[in-house]
């Protein structure tokens, strides 16, 4: 049996064996060692060409195939369809947009085999055409909230990935950061790459991939919340952890970012707000708005995801909620 995978931007720059391991999480026995064996045995292609290097790097939009042995196919566990309370922001015969809450994983992994956005998409797909095959077009970090796009067909998936590439789509995020940002707007042009010492982190590096983020100041915290700024960030490139790393490198770490931030809540004057900031359990980052040419119809598609309750409460306490409208 041939399994076909279209990589997304979250896979860009990753090792081939690790990408297969993530996308084959629904297969029993598809360990990293087993995946590497399939690659070395010539069972894998990338964009139609055989690849024998387990450490080969993939790019977003690559088409991967693996010829699975019969023994693996017979032990396959189907990805379960699960009814989850998700808000649909947009839907047509080709695409669906969902407002992902914080704490929810987009696609099943070894650690999160169920309870993901993809499981919920399969549940909704029960009412679609029999020929439709749901898939996720983009991803967000587990603790980042906001817009994620699903496709109903392989053709729509590939077309939407192309539409979202580069600066052809306006992808805007809300980011609550520590620091009083003085300028009204600016651009962060900083190369980033995986940290060689910790592959779960991304660092600024002259040898990294080009990464560009435009930002605009939406508002600064009231007097008691001095030291907080709400930014709108627009991605030109879409690297893993790009906004988080770019803002931290600029001296404006995201509130709640345990990986790249600092405990700057101590500098906030208001005691109640200070405690709310200390206890905020995630990075204060939200995929807010998307404007893109619909790849199947040619119409302009505009989608907006209201901030979730936890971020709304924090913005209200800081006197910034009106800036996120």
Where does each model-flagged region fall?
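RNA pseudouridine synthases
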Residues: 1-199, 222-224, 306-325
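Structural motif
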Residues: 62-63, 239, 299
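Short Gly/Pro-enriched turn/cap motifs at secondary-structure boundaries
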Residues: 138-139, 203-207, 279-282
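Short coil-to-beta-strand transition motifs
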Residues: 79-83, 204-213, 284-285
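Pseudouridine synthase
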Residues: 113-121, 152-154, 194, 225-292, ...
